[in-house]
């Protein structure tokens, strides 16, 4: 593994021109795919070597991979080539999106409003996984979402109850949305729809390669959902947490009944997504293979985006404490830990590509340092995935808002300002930080 990654970096160093044309895909198509990633105690392993993740979030990979008006396979190839050039070996992608009435949901989805599956987008997923495999990379494949931007649990509930709630609806202030969405775990009909969809994806055969997903080593992990929470209020969590744990355990069992080769993960934020409860974290990760933590200092009020200089010190201390808490929990549970989402705004909370990102760079290096320190001390942290890769995409609108019909997909989901957290291909300081860390992990 270490030789492959080092030689890939060296071999690609002089090949930047092919990125502009998408021509690197064939160059890397002959790379040997990794063995199935597995868990041994607190380690993720590939063969007899630890598998350390230097990764990115790229939720939109299947959309680019679709042979459809909204797809752009040439761009997908260029973006994956850029990530490979940086030394990254893992991407986290969405394999679920449910069409429905929620105003912030991406369209098209994998599951159409009438419940039928979208063959074009499924083909896009096939293509994305095949392209990831060509580059010797792996994917975390996410099968659902607690949040509304891809439809998610709220849409499954809507399909069986006829009722829904938009996030940030003034008529339903926080935490009404997470409490309402957590009702999913106790609704047998909604869970049945989710399970049916999970079966369709996990048991799928890639239409382009003829390989069953269950037999494809390019898939590192099936992930139950993006950031599933047990609720938002004391009462909501108390009401839903037992059904929540049961849903996790049953879903992990379902996936393993369909696929004996791949890891299963939850996609959890950590204690911030568990109403501060370490006990919920322990229970939630009992039946999955590794822990995840997501770290969002601005969203959680730990820093002020308009005054990062004055709020950085206190905020970064909370970040370090959060990382340490989850490393301790992973050690206690004897399981690996991945910091699979972390994001930070640019200086002044602006959105434009190439603009200063002094504190974002400092933040990324804080996360990366924690990964590297854990490695040196034989700890459980096996890597990270930054949120998120924007690459060559650029917004077409002065207000940086995504509009229906826009096709320049970014790591910033459509309901958020385009450029808020994502890393563009000309963010040189950020690319250097990401590449430095990938290099540090490249030799075992």
Model-derived features: positions:
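N-terminal secretory signal peptides and thylakoid transit peptides that target proteins
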Residues: 1-16
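Hydrophobic h-region of N-terminal signal peptides that target proteins for export
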Residues: 16-22
């Amino acid at each position: 593994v270490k030789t492959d990654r080092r030689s890939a970096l060296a071999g690609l160093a002089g090949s930047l021109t092919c990125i502009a044309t998408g021509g690197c895909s064939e160059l890397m198509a002959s790379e040997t795919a990794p063995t199935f990633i597995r868990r041994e105690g607190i380690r993720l392993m590939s063969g007899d070597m630890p598998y350390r993740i230097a990764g990115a979030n790229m939720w939109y990979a299947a959309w680019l991979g679709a042979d459809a008006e909204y797809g752009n396979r040439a761009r997908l190839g260029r973006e994956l080539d850029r990530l490979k050039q940086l030394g990254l070996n893992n991407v986290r992608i969405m394999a679920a999106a449910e069409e429905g009435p929620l105003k912030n949901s991406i369209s098209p989805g994998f599951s159409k409003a009438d419940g039928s599956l979208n063959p074009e987008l499924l083909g896009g997923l096939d293509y994305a996984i095949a392209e990831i495999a060509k580059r010797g990379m792996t994917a975390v494949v996410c099968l659902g979402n607690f949040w509304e931007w891809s439809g998610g649990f709220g849409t499954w509930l809507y399909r069986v109850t006829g009722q829904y709630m938009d996030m940030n609806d003034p008529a339903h202030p926080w935490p009404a949305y997470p409490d309402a969405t957590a009702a999913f775990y106790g609704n047998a009909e909604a869970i049945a729809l989710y399970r049916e969809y999970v079966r369709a994806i996990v048991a799928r055969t890639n239409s382009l390669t003829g390989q069953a997903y269950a037999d494809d080593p390019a898939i590192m992990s099936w992930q139950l959902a993006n950031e599933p929470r047990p609720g938002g209020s004391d009462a909501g969590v108390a009401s839903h947490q037992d059904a929540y744990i049961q849903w996790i355990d049953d879903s992990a069992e379902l996936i393993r009944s369909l696929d004996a080769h791949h890891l299963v993960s939850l996609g959890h934020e950590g204690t911030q997504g568990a109403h501060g409860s370490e006990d919920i974290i322990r229970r939630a990760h009992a039946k999955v293979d590794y822990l995840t933590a997501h770290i969002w200092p601005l969203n959680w009020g730990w820093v002020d985006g308009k005054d990062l200089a004055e709020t950085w010190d206190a905020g970064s201390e909370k970040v370090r404490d959060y990382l340490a808490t989850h490393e301790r929990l992973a050690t206690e549970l004897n399981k690996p830990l991945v910091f699979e989402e972390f994001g930070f705004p640019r200086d002044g909370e602006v959105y434009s590509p190439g603009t200063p990102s002094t504190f974002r760079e400092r933040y990324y290096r804080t996360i990366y340092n924690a990964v590297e320190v854990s490695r040196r001390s034989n700890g459980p942290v096996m890597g990270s995935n930054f949120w998120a890769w924007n690459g060559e995409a650029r917004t077409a609108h002065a207000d940086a808002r995504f509009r229906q019909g826009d096709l320049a997909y970014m790591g910033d989901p459509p309901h958020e300002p385009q450029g808020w957290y994502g890393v563009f291909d000309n963010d040189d300081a950020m690319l250097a930080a990401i590449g430095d860390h990938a290099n540090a992990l490249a030799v075992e």
